[in-house]
């Protein structure tokens, strides 16, 4: 805010408009490995990224064939939480599945 004196010895406050930027977005990416079963990857994509079975299977095949697949794009906090949930679930199930986040 700027203080601007007017001609009658009183003060007028002038509010500067703040421009809000949308939050940075992050891709959540699954990485391929030679040990995690394909069906487990499909289940992870369905459970944590709310994809239907067909879409989850397409993402799993992309991970398998290309080495990586994007599961979704989220704000930083949500992406970070999803990465942590996926990695924790994979470790508890005994799988080395890797999940990372990258700026979109």
Swiss-Prot record:
GO terms for biological process: protein catabolic process; proteolysis. It comes from the Bacteria. InterPro entries: ClpS (IPR022935), ClpS_core (IPR003769), Ribosomal_bL12_C/ClpS-like (IPR014719). Binds to the N-terminal domain of the chaperone ClpA. PANTHER family: ATP-DEPENDENT CLP PROTEASE ADAPTER PROTEIN CLPS (PTHR33473:SF19), ATP-DEPENDENT CLP PROTEASE ADAPTER PROTEIN CLPS1, CHLOROPLASTIC (PTHR33473). Involved in the modulation of the specificity of the ClpAP-mediated ATP-dependent protein degradation. Belongs to the ClpS family. This is ATP-dependent Clp protease adapter protein ClpS. It comes from Burkholderia thailandensis (strain ATCC 700388 / DSM 13276 / CCUG 48851 / CIP 106301 / E264).
């Amino acid at each position: 805010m700027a203080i601007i004196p007017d001609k009658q010895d009183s003060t007028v406050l002038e509010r500067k408009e703040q421009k809000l930027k949308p939050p940075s977005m992050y891709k959540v990416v699954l990485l391929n490995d030679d040990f995690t079963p394909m069906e487990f990857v499909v289940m992870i994509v369905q459970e944590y990224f709310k994809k239907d079975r067909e879409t989850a299977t397409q993402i799993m095949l992309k991970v398998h064939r290309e080495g990586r697949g994007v599961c979704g794009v989220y704000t930083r906090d949500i992406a970070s939480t999803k990465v942590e949930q996926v990695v924790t679930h994979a470790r508890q199930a005994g799988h080395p599945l890797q999940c990372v986040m990258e700026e979109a």
